[in-house]
Amino acid sequence: MVFLSGNASDSSNCTQPPAPVNISKAILLGVILGGLILFGVLGNILVILSVACHRHLHSVTHYYIVNLAVADLLLTSTVLPFSAIFEVLGYWAFGRVFCNIWAAVDVLCCTASIMGLCIISIDRYIGVSYPLRYPTIVTQRRGLMALLCVWALSLVISIGPLFGWRQPAPEDETICQINEEPGYVLFSALGSFYLPLAIILVMYCRVYVVAKRESRGLKSGLKTDKSDSEQVTLRIHRKNAPAGGSGMASAKTKTHFSVRLLKFSREKKAAKTLGIVVGCFVLCWLPFFLVMPIGSFFPDFKPSETVFKIVFWLGYLNSCINPIIYPCSSQEFKKAFQNVLRIQCLCRKQSSKHALGYTLHPPSQAVEGQHKDMVRIPVGSRETFYRISKTDGVCEWKFFSSMPRGSARITVSKDQSSCTTARVRSKSFLQVCCCVGPSTPSLDKNHQVPTIKVHTISLSENGEEV
């Protein structure tokens, strides 16, 4: 990260003419570092646009990801170009004042990025541990306050050298060296890396424990019966639920379990994606924060200039690879990236021609007819359906819950009297409204046709989302 690379520790305070530049080496470094910087800038811009242009990504978790992308974008656009020029030329060409400002901005952006990952880890712990209460715990206001605290703490850590907390600067202004003042190195290493890292590791360890426990609990509630057609039926049982009770209470229990399973599966998948981000962060930054304090407190063990430059740029690399991680580990981001690259911004509502249309036959026919895998479970005056199609150990689970008629735009097909077609726009995961109509068309124009909200999710045999 941070305080700036430099090879000034072996230089004198006397002004010396810059060494001649090796042209072939400069061109090679320029191409490699320039490509890395360009990739980081464009990738982080793509992350920001993907969230900004898709309403279903307008959540507190994704705002944290945008904050991470903003910090990385500032680093790759305002710090890395000067770092690359420094490496290519072999000396600092922008003066002492700008060297100090550049160093402070470097520390600011890197610290904000690391603390942003810390906030994300806490967010994922809450999401996995309390999936149903998450929206009330993590509100937009609290999310904004957390981000303000991140940048405030980052600013406090970064401005110390601007107020004199550093070793005396060399007289030669072509030298822009790293701040090796032991007190500041310890303060910045603890505040910028080790304390956030400790929080991140604790949070993700707890996420792992909770996810394992919840997966076992949810799996125990899935009772399946195999048939010759390799179709299985989902039966929901609420743990510790009373044996007796009204049908309404039982139905509410089943619905609550289903919603809990959906929310937990989504939060767990998000935690996996961001866990990969954190893993890459540790691999990129840990070498630097091991080398830096050792070189400051034990000069005899200071690594060579080449080793220092490698671990220094390895930390910078972290700000460029996050945009690769999102689409590779999240289908949600992959589709959002594709839409942005195709200039298909979805800020506005999609037109009806892009809406998903589904036709559903009456449930009585589905249960008694050819669709033996469709099970009808009464939920009060409404209905819930569960279906699992088993293929190579992967099951597709569909949860149908009734919803108000006004939530979907309903059109009755004149050619198909056995069903009614409903259309609705998909959101963060597949959400489709289907209408179950009577087997014969109704003569009453004001007849209220019930609608059904469909949630589709793929589960493996152990109940985990795939």
Curated annotation (Swiss-Prot):
Expressed in heart, brain, liver and prostate, but not in kidney, lung, adrenal, aorta and pituitary. Within the prostate, expressed in the apex, base, periurethral and lateral lobe. Isoform 4 is the most abundant isoform expressed in the prostate with high levels also detected in liver and heart. Glycans are attached at residues 7, 13, 22. Residues 1-27, 89-99, 168-181, 298-305 are extracellular. SMART domains: 7TM_GPCR_Srsx. A lipid is attached at residue 345 (S-palmitoyl cysteine). InterPro entries: ADR_fam (IPR002233), ADRA1A_rcpt (IPR001004), GPCR_Rhodpsn (IPR000276), GPCR_Rhodpsn_7TM (IPR017452). It is found in: Nucleus membrane; Cell membrane; Cytoplasm; Membrane, Caveola. It is a multi-pass membrane protein. The lineage of its organism: Eukaryota, Metazoa, Chordata, Craniata, Vertebrata. It comes from Homo sapiens. This is Alpha-1A adrenergic receptor.
